[in-house]
Amino acid sequence: LLLFPRLAAVAEVAWSSPTEKRWDRFLMTLDNYQERWEMKGIQPSRAMYNIGHEVVPSFGGLRVSLNCVRPDGEIRYTTDGSEPHRYSSIYRRPWIVKKTQVIKCATFKDGEQMGQTLVLPIRMNPVTGRNLLRSNPIERRMVNGVRGSLKCTDGEWASWAKNDSIVLTFDVGSHKGLHHLLLGCLNN
């Protein structure tokens, strides 16, 4: 339940003076609360352990960056589509992907998986990682090889207002024949 970590955060903000508010100390307090809640049969949300990502064109490939709001967890990942485990590679810095692959990652603490597994299927095609002429940072997502999910908050969707008109020009680098174009849309 997301309610329980949020209630603890509200209490911390209300009861602590501004000079006493420290994120690292709050995390330790929250860990103690979580142990108590679990002993009472309450399953608090572990969303703070979930991983955020950014996949952007870079150096002829895609730069993959991972992050978590919890600085005390280890992000472990695989690039072969297998589930991450306590002995999987530890994420230390962004890396460049140049081929189709499935990245799976999760946050671990003391060898235990804490958050949900993030699955990033990266698909390479003639447009992946290429320049978009006249692009803004949001439109770069359209050539990052990651398809948006049904969750519009996954960071993979570009949006325009109803009166916006867009023109996307893809630079494929040479005269290559494109046989078909697949464009995913989520209409609100």
Which residues does each PLM region occupy?
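A short beta-strand element within beta-rich, extracytoplasmic domains
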Residues: K176-N188
